[in-house]
Amino acid sequence: MNDTVFLPSRRFGGIARLYGDEALARFSRAHVCVVGVGGVGSWAVEALARTGIGRLTLIDLDNVAESNVNRQLHALTDDFGKAKVTALRERIAQINPQCEVEEIEDFVTEDNLETLFRRPFDFVIDAIDQVRIKAAMAAYFVQHNQPFILSGGAGGQKNPALIQTADLSRVTHDPLLANLRYTLRKRYGFSRDTKEKMRVPCVFSTENITLPQSGEACSTDTAPQGLSCAGYGASMLVTASFGLYCAQAAVEHIAGRK
């Protein structure tokens, strides 16, 4: 863990006034991992950096593309073709030069999951759309008491006011998370009792998905990692809000630690 402690200053004074000096010190020492830094994850990273989180590990193998412009923070003309984790590291350096950023240009797989998460993080945000890998991560995190939150699908939605957080057992309206719930119960032995929490916190929306005006929606288990929303239409009004909900969960968890 990074031992640097930020004292309240012009840069993060507003955070100290809101959360308190002790919480700001905890933020500066915290290490948060974001898996998938696309339409949801990139905005989560921005929020964490602007809240004074002292160390960030970013995991993604994708590059910034022109088709990302409608929903991803780092999708700027000058950054097309650049690794997403690199584009974000460069941006974070302008926000908080003291923030340590580790770039991992890779996708999480069932083979490398244990290696990537062997070290404990203060919090992990999952913002990928591959069900099999989301399930493997969720099962691993629950087993190892790793604090985390999963993002549901953010494509095909227009109203950020309908976003909420809940345990996976309580999630509705989200095909990605419904598939995840089924997979965890079938492959990893999670309880099928609908009254019992699964200990898998999620961000999701109760909005009914709007199907594409043309083309076909992508399969959530065959698309590249990162909540690409490539098949559904997508707006940053929603994808960014999902990311901010994820970041809020991380910040509140870290602020509440003693």
Regions found by a protein language model. Name each.
Residues 34-36, 59:
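Conserved N-terminal Rossmann-fold NAD(P)-binding element of oxidoreductases
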Residues 104-113:
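Conserved SAM/SAH-binding loop
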Residues 55-96:
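Glycine-rich phosphate-binding loop and adjoining beta1-alpha1-beta2 segment
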Residues 1-33, 66:
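N-terminal charged helix/coil linker that caps or initiates catalytic domains
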